[in-house]
């Protein structure tokens, strides 16, 4: 996306996967010790720090990718004001916003997708894991801005659109994508929070939904 843009920014303590490029995108040194060479072009900034983000953005920056809740990094929930400021900054500078919802998507946070809790609309969203309810599936969703960039057959996969897996995903969405189900997620999350905060030795509980 964009001419000569070959750099992307992710956040420290993020986790984006275990393939070579997603390991490069992951902002944790512990995951950078075993597989080489990594895909080049990734820079990292501290979460909830716009000055740190702006310091690593350049005219080569294509996208900023983030997890709204950093799971592997310690269940760090990004500050809503930071996220909104980040999205506005990226929109103003024609930088794509990618939200990795592999661990937070499909009802886990009390909304169908976690970014709905923040009132933002990313340019690209990745979803997997719970979407297949145990069956292997991954989805990359993009908006109008990328319709001419990610055209049919641009990306492919041996297992893509497996009919059994897609049928499973349809069932999951039919079950999860309704207000009553999602309200129960938040209700149960609040129940666990109330119980856990009463246990001696637990200093704090961080959650969004379940």
Question: Which residues does each PLM region occupy?
Answer:
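Conserved N-terminal phosphate-binding loop of PLP-dependent enzymes in the Aspartate aminotransferase
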Residues: 1-210
């Amino acid at each position: 996306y964009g001419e000569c843009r070959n750099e992307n920014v992710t956040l420290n303590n993020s986790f984006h996967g275990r393939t070579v490029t997603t390991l490069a995108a992951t902002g944790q040194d512990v995951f950078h010790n075993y597989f080489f060479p990594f895909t080049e072009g990734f820079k990292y900034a501290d979460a909830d720090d716009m000055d740190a983000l702006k310091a690593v953005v350049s005219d080569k920056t294509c996208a900023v990718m983030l997890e709204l809740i950093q799971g592997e990094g310690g269940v760090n929930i990004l500050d809503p004001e930071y996220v909104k400021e980040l999205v506005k900054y990226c929109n103003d500078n024609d930088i794509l916003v990618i939200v990795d919802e592999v661990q937070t998507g499909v009802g886990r946070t009390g909304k169908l997708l976690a970014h709905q809790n923040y009132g933002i609309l990313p340019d690209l969203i990745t979803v997997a894991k719970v979407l297949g309810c145990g069956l292997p599936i991954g989805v990359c969703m993009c908006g109008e801005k990328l319709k001419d960039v990610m055209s049919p057959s641009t990306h492919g996969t041996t297992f893509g659109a497996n009919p059994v897996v897609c049928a499973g995903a349809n069932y999951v969405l039919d079950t999860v994508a309704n207000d009553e189900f999602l309200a129960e997620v938040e209700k149960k999350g609040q129940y666990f929070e109330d119980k856990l905060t009463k246990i001696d030795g637990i200093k704090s509980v961080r959650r969004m939904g379940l």
